[in-house]
Amino acid sequence: TYLALLAGVAVDAGLIRDVNEPVVARLPGIGFDSPHNAPITWQHLLQQTSEWEGSLFGVPDQVDRYRTVQYQPKAAQGRKGDPRPLQAPGSFWEYNDVRINQLSFALMHLFRRPLPEVFAEAITRPIGASDQWRWVGYDNAWVEVDGRRMQSVPGGTHWGGGVSIDSV
């Protein structure tokens, strides 16, 4: 995904020194401070095994628990959105858009810049891609980072927003 590419850019820039480092070590105060979330690493977020618990911009992670997608390792054991006991971070795979969006939120805080800017500078411009693409966030996903107001963008398009890019 675009977020995996940007995580690679962060590794290359030295912003992520070790994908096994807990996210909270560099980014306290953005949703990784609880006893359950504190052990979550960049690798867990990227591999969708974080089991991150919380709400992001008013959407709780529970809405995507037990979500079924074609390529998942095994069938969901409940109905989408039902409560499910959380496992230890890194021990359970589940596709969850809120958790993907939390990865995006964390990367934005790590770069201290809007991700569309970083994506253009590090990915699309260097490869000569068209600038006719958009990465749109949700209306309520505005935050202030270092005195600059910026929009956190989603990693997917499940609830609108996301990346629109031409393949030509």
Name the predicted role of every residue range.
Residues 1, 56-140, 156, 162-163:
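Catalytic-site signature segments of enzymes, centered on catalytic residues
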Residues 1-5, 21, 40-43, 97-101, ...:
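A structural signal for well-ordered alpha-helical segments within the folded catalytic domains
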Residues 6, 35, 56-58:
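Short, conserved acidic/polar surface loops in the N-terminal third of protein domains
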Residues 6-7, 119:
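Active-site-flanking alpha-helical
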Residues 13-53, 82, 109-161:
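Active-site helix/loop module of the DD-peptidase/beta-lactamase fold
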